């Protein structure tokens, strides 16, 4: 996936213009037995891509362990999209909104600390976020389109422009971009409120 065409404003896939027609299906909200049907239904509607959020607070358990079973098996969902001939827009957050408790962030991040989240000056948040994103990278990197997988792009953050941090820092977005770039991901996108 790259940008090109007239004025460099078209999505290009394998050197040809490509229009992303996407459905939003969050596997953590859908019983696993229905995943394939939902993906097939999106494809039958003429769509070619599945976008989905990952809810961090469903994966990281209160004891610090990680649960990638059942609806949380993000890798299996991506692989199923590929089996069904669909591309993927990977939206791991860490904040996803999605009308989900704390936007998918684990509640331990706000238990004792009043320092803003989504801020590079919050060491607890940055360390926890790094642990989470390492898990996401293990899943995503081998499944990027450049590696033969279905993931076209990685969303760096969700609705960050709508988030009014007292620090109003772009360093946070740059940190996310650097993290994913060092892992070999790209291109990236942001999604802002309309």
Residues of each region from the PLM?
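N-terminal carbohydrate-binding accessory modules
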Residues: 1-49, 79, 83
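Active-site-adjacent "subsite" loops/lids of carbohydrate-active enzymes
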Residues: 96-138
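Aromatic-lined substrate-binding rim segments of carbohydrate-active enzymes
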Residues: 35-103, 107-109, 176-186
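Hydrophobic faces of well-ordered beta-strands that scaffold small-molecule active sites
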Residues: 19-23, 48-52, 88-92, 152-156, ...
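Solvent-exposed, acidic/flexible segments
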Residues: 28, 32, 67, 71, ...
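A generic structural signal for short coil/turn motifs at secondary-structure boundaries
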Residues: 30-31, 60-64, 161-166
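Active-site beta-loop-alpha junctions enriched in small/polar residues
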Residues: 26, 55, 93-97, 156-161, ...
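Active-site neighborhood of glycoside hydrolase catalytic domains
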Residues: 124-194
